[in-house]
Amino acid sequence: MRKWLALLLFPLTVQAAGEGAWQDSGMGVTLNYRGVSASSSPLSARQPVSGVMTLVAWRYELNGPTPAGLRVRLCSQSRCVELDGQSGTTHGFAHVPAVEPLRFVWEVPGGGRLIPALKVRSNQVIVNYR
């Protein structure tokens, strides 16, 4: 019973310490050509937040094979971080205001049509801040 109570009260403790987290997710994009960048819709906090980002977790799902050379970045208004896989965490946004929206940016280098097209099914971020 004590463990359950502790789990229920944990979010209140975190907020009292001035820390928190927000998450957002969205539909992905379709990229038909190499050498062209495509950006997701902005992902942002649904409630007012203050403070700076500490740790950001990301996840995206592709609908089909990963094209050779795929470059994926997660960008705030002030900086971008290269992502090394379909999910992970980064401290690359440390000290960026937690209120800034994030966007995924996809690009496959080269030229010509992508066959099959790159289809991003979904993308998600969880932003921890203090």
Curated annotation (Swiss-Prot):
InterPro entries: FlhE (IPR009420). The keyword Thylakoid does not apply. Residues 1-16 form the signal peptide. The keyword Signal applies. Keywords: Bacterial flagellum biogenesis, Signal. Coiled coil: none annotated. GO terms for biological process: bacterial-type flagellum organization. Not essential for flagellar formation and function. This is Flagellar protein FlhE. It comes from Salmonella typhimurium (strain LT2 / SGSC1412 / ATCC 700720).
